[in-house]
Amino acid sequence: MVQRAVPSIGPSLGSSAPGFGTDGIRGRAGTELSPALCLQVGYWIGRVLKADGPVLIGMDSRSSGSMLVAALTAGLTAAGRDVWELGLCATPAVPLLIREVGAAGGLMVSASHNPPADNGIKVFGADGTKLSAERQARVETGLRGEVEDDGPSRCGRSVQRQDLLRSYQDKLLSSVGDRRLNGVPIVLDLCWGSATACAAEVFQTLGADLTVLHGQPDGERINVACGSTQLDPLRQAVVAQGAVMGFAFDGDADRMLAVDARGRVVDGDHVLYLWGSVLQDQKALPGDRLVATVMSNLGFERAWERRGGELERTPVGDQHVHAAMVANGAALGGEQSGHILAASHGLCGDGVLTALQLATLCHGQDIALSDWLDRSFKAYPQKLVNVTVPDRARRKGWSSCMPLQEAVLQAEASMGAAGRVLVRASGTEPVLRVMVESEDQSLVDRWTQHLAAMADEHLNAA
C-alpha cells in the first residue's frame, strides 16, 4: 500500500492515529482531540462519505466545541464537501435533519456524559445511522496514511443553518400527537448542555408547569454534578417543588433518566418496561420483543418474561441495539443508561423525545409516574465498579487474565441462575467495568469487591 501525505491537510498520523470507540472518537480536547487531528478526521470523513449533498455539523455546549467544529469544517471543505453548521443542538437532531434535507452525512461534536474537558466526534451516514464499521475503518486507514488519495476536484464551503433546528422541535411536538401536559408540574435538569436548546420550549408548548435546572449552555459546567450522571439535584427539586416527575439529560441529550414524585430513579430499563407494556397492550409490539443490552437488570428480564414477552440482549452501545432492532423488526429497545430507540420515531436515541413520551403517556392515562413505577418490576440489586487499568489491559489484556477469569467463574457458580456477572472494557474511558447483580445484596457486595480487587491487582501489576 502506498503511503503518502495529503498536501492539503498535512502529514498523515501514522500509528498514532486514533480509532473509533463505541460512540465515535473521544479524548481530551486540545491534546488527544486536537484541531490538527480534527482537520484530518474531517477530511477523511469527507472522502469516505459517498452520497452527494452537504455534511451537517452540530455540537453541544463544551467550550472546545467551536474550535473542533472549525477544524472539522476545514477538513470537510478541503475534501470538497459543503458544510451546514447547526450550532448548539441535541445529537438526535443531526440524523433527523440528515434524512430530511438529503445530506451526505453528519457529525456531532460532543463527549456525551463525559467531563467538560473531553470532547468527541459522532459520525452519521446518509441514512442517519452511525457510520458503519467498514467506513470507520476506511477513515482510520486514511488517518494512518495507508491509502492513495488524489484529492477532490473542488473546495467546499460552509454556511450557518441553525434555522433547520425548528424542524427538529416540530418533530418532537408531533411525536406525542394530541396529548398535552396542561398544568402538570415537571422539573427538567438540562445539565448546561444540548438540551438547553430545545427541551424547555417543547415542554412549555405542551402546557407543562415547568421548573428548569441548569438551563443555560455552559461549556465549563456541562455534566458537572448535574444531569443524568448525577441525579441528586433533580431528585431534591422534584420533591421540594411537589412535582409529579422530573427528567435529567446528558450533555448531548440523546439519553434521559427520570425520577418520580418520591425521588425514585426511573432508568432505561423501567422506561422500556413501561413504554413496552403500553405497546404490548395495544398489540403494537411485534413478537412482544424488547431489545436491551447486557447491562439491563435481571429483574427487568424476569418481569418482562412474566408478561409473556421476550428480551433480546446485545453488547453495550446503542448501535448494537439499533442493529438488532432492524434485523428483527423490533419496535422498542434501549439501554439501562437511558438511550431509548423507537422504530416509530426514527430509531435514534433521543432523550427529550423519550421524556415527552413518558410524561404524556402518564398524563394521558391519568396515572402518576410513581404509581406506574410501583406496577413495573423490582430490580435485582446491581453494582457497577470502574477499575482504572492501563490502555493495553483495557483493549485486550484483561480477557486473558486467568486469575480474574477464574474469579468470574466462581462468582457465577455462587449465584447460579439468580445472578449475573459482566466484565467489560469501556469503549471511551481507560477503565474496566465490573458489574454484579443478584437477588442477594450480600452476594453482590461480596463479589463486586472481590472481582474489582482481582482486576486491580493483576491488571495494574508493574
Swiss-Prot record:
CDD domains with a match to the protein in the record: GlmM
A Pfam family: PGM_PMM_I
UniProtKB keywords: Isomerase, Magnesium, Metal-binding, Phosphoprotein
GO molecular function (one): magnesium ion binding
Binding locations of Mg(2+): S112, D250, D252, D254
EC code(s) of this entry: 5.4.2.10
Chemical reaction(s) catalysed: alpha-D-glucosamine 1-phosphate = D-glucosamine 6-phosphate
PTM section of the record: Activated by phosphorylation.
One example of a Gene Ontology biological process annotation: UDP-N-acetylglucosamine biosynthetic process
Cofactor(s) the protein requires to work: Mg(2+)
SUPFAM superfamilies: Phosphoglucomutase, C-terminal domain, Phosphoglucomutase, first 3 domains
Its biological purpose: Catalyzes the conversion of glucosamine-6-phosphate to glucosamine-1-phosphate.
Family the UniProt entry places it in: Belongs to the phosphohexose mutase family.
Name of the protein in its database record: Phosphoglucosamine mutase
